[in-house]
């Protein structure tokens, strides 16, 4: 079991501990549960889906990286496929506060970058901030997304985001988590190709500035993040954050990164290079390359 889970695991009910122990035994537990695993946990504990998601939140929150606030938030995004995806907030010392990742963004990106097609619900241990409510409104599940909070009845996103402004107001038809392929040819080595593939999946209807980041760890594992724009602009999630979300949730740490590649267009209206390289350097990675999409 990864050390970060030990404290939260010890506080779970005995029957949930017994059912989870073989799942969490792998140090690189992928911070997700398949539909089959969810069904097995429900049978072992007698909990329904909502109660099980709440019971698992401490494990999601244990994935948080909060050196600034020490305020850990966990989220679980429930995919329409039946898979549940953990998420947690992340802060980066030496970067800017704008680089911060919220737990809801983490769980949603985890699902999206894992190939999930849509979300049915999201469970969070604290009320989503306005930033996250706006981020969720970019999803193809839209205002119908169910939000579950401890001690409250479940409500749709529309109940938390009154008079919402979103992609439909800007006549955007392709939404976050819809399948997208911008068709750039995969060239270069495996890491460069992973970055280009991530750029091809970008959701960037507002700036038309595709970008993707791929991180290579010392053991050869590659994590890729795609750019995810938002109708309100500021809740946009950069591609580096997507890659860092996966790296963190899959049990890796920043010192494990040995090389990074950013793929973007040289003449794009928005450029990721400066922010990406600055944040990576703050995390200790200085081997950073840029591949131009053409």
From Swiss-Prot:
Cofactor binding mode and count: Binds 1 zinc ion.
Enzyme Commission (EC) number: 3.5.4.5
Domain of life: Bacteria
Domain CMP/dCMP-type deaminase, residue spans: 48-168, 186-294
Keyword hit for Methyltransferase: no
Name recorded for this polypeptide: Cytidine deaminase
GO molecular function, one term: zinc ion binding
InterPro entries per the UniProt record, alphabetical: APOBEC/CMP_deaminase_Zn-bd, CMP_dCMP_dom, Cyd/dCyd_deaminase_Zn-bd, Cyt/Deoxycyt_deaminase, Cyt_deam_dimer, Cytidine_deaminase-like, Cytidine_deaminase_bacteria
Biological process (GO), any one: cytidine deamination
Primary gene name: cdd
Function comment: This enzyme scavenges exogenous and endogenous cytidine and 2'-deoxycytidine for UMP synthesis.
Catalytic activity: cytidine + H2O + H(+) = uridine + NH4(+); 2'-deoxycytidine + H2O + H(+) = 2'-deoxyuridine + NH4(+)
Family recorded in the similarity comment: Belongs to the cytidine and deoxycytidylate deaminase family.
Annotated binding of Zn(2+), by residue: 102, 129, 132
Subunit structure: Homodimer.
Pfam families: dCMP_cyt_deam_1, dCMP_cyt_deam_2
